[in-house]
């Protein structure tokens, strides 16, 4: 099961429904949309994710961007996630998604230029109802497609959730790969250090 809002109330509700359906705990799990995206993107050909991948989800007034990059840790590739949100973008409900994007493409493109000046990604994936259109405006398309592969679709999260479920019986992600999306870090990680002869804990990660 994949959900957009990883909130405890929603997770508890899903858990209660699943229990009433009499599924065992090992038969189901809940993952975030970002994690579904990571499963989907990193199950593709290596050339599509080698430098990193970006997801742009335009379902609401602002665009959510999720960027996944690999870091090597003790011989393992760790997929780390960074998330960013644009400012609210004016949207006219009387017009279709293409017409709205034509009006707002310069504002969105400038935001993406700032974001992608910090990251080198191999591919960009577009999803969300406000990106649902047959073609995309020229300025927006020229920028995104420059030295990058770009894909658009509305079933990305579903495909990613299916691939995530398959990991229990089949290798989906590349060998020696650890998925470390933010919702996967469920505990704090600390190590003891000594500073000026004083023992103290160093916090490495926290939920």
Predicted features along the sequence, with ranges:
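Gly/Thr-rich phosphate-binding beta-strand-loop-beta motif of the actin/hexokinase/Hsp70
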Residues: 41-83
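Repeat-based blade/solenoid architectures
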Residues: 155-160
């Amino acid at each position: 099961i994949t959900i957009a809002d990883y909130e405890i109330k929603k997770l508890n509700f899903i858990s209660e429904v699943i229990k009433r359906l009499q599924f065992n705990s090992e038969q189901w799990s809940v993952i975030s949309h970002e994690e579904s995206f990571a499963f989907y993107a990193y199950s593709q050909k290596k050339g599509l994710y080698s430098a990193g991948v970006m997801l742009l989800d335009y379902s609401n007034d602002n665009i959510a961007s999720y960027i996944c990059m690999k870091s090597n840790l003790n011989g393992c590739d760790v997929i780390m996630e960074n998330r960013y949100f644009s400012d609210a973008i004016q949207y006219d409900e009387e017009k279709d998604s293409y017409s709205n994007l034509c009006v707002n493409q310069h504002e969105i493109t400038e935001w993406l230029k700032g974001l992608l000046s910090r990251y080198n990604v191999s591919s960009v994936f577009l999803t969300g109802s406000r990106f649902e259109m047959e073609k995309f405006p020229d300025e927006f398309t020229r920028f995104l497609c420059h030295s990058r592969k770009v894909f658009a679709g509305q079933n990305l999260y579903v495909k990613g959730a299916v691939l995530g479920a398959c990991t229990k019986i089949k290798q989906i992600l590349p060998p020696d790969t650890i998925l470390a999306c933010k919702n996967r870090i469920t505990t704090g990680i600390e190590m003891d250090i000594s500073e000026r002869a004083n023992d103290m804990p160093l916090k490495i990660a926290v939920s």
